[in-house]
Amino acid sequence: MPKRGLGIGMIVVCLIFLPATYAKTITQNFCKLSDFKCIRVKRHQSWESLFPDDHDRDIVKRINRLNIELYPGILLAVPKNLSTSNIMDFSPFPLKVDPQDEKLVIVSPAAEAWAAYDVDGTLIRWGPASAGANYCRDIGKPCHTHPGSFRVFTLGSSNCISHKFPLPNGGAPMPYCMYFNNGQALHGEPNGLPGYNASHGCVRLYVNDAEWLRYDFIEGPNPDNDYRGTQVIVEPYYPASSSSSPDEDDEE
């Protein structure tokens, strides 16, 4: 991954065209690369039995964008140089962008990932994400996470819950929620990420990633930032989405 500076506009261009690359699952596309091997999970195999080392296990989970409990038949892409790899080696985002003079979070539903850039434009952390699904059966319509530029306006704790889902009374856990667009928020997913966009419009994250964003990176409105919370840019799912208006669904 080149380390030269890239502007935010370049990120938008790069990620808009990601769906052609990510037309299949993230895992299937990695499996086509010579630097990866792919395995089918067998009965009684688990993350721990397949990848006893914490470092290796974390990288494989993040590459495949999932951390749910493994089941027989699931496909996993594994780097051939796993033991010497760093998670930044597999970032779908540039390692450096033009400085924006403020911190920035980018969410790419196409890459099923998020990125955190410091004020100097350096990528300091990225991770898997599960954004709004193409269709939600319980409400009978699409529930994409809305593309655009937003700012975090409300921060929650580990006890944050949805007041809407599951229907009709809500109650779904949304630990470390960070609301950025009406009822849409970044938050942890205690049940794990499945490797595809599956939410009602929120952006689901690993719980430890959400906790880090909530307490170590993202800021809500306060006097020090002129009451402008941390910027969150949500990229389109595909080029057409920039000219369409998916139905809005609040919360998880």
Where are these regions (language model features)?
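Primarily a LysM-type cell-wall glycan-binding module
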Residues: 25-55
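Extracellular LysM carbohydrate-binding repeats and other cell-envelope/extracellular binding modules
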Residues: 24-32, 57-93
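A structural motif detector for short, solvent-exposed N-terminal "entry" segments of globular domains
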Residues: 88-137
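Solvent-exposed coil/turn segments that connect beta secondary-structure elements
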Residues: 65, 80-83, 110-111, 119-122, ...
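Exported/periplasmic cell-wall-interacting domains
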Residues: 141-147, 159-252
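Extracytoplasmic
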Residues: 34-36, 55, 71-73, 99-102, ...
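Bacterial N-terminal signal peptides that target proteins for export
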Residues: 1-8
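N-terminal signal peptide c-region/cleavage motif recognized by signal peptidases
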Residues: 18-20
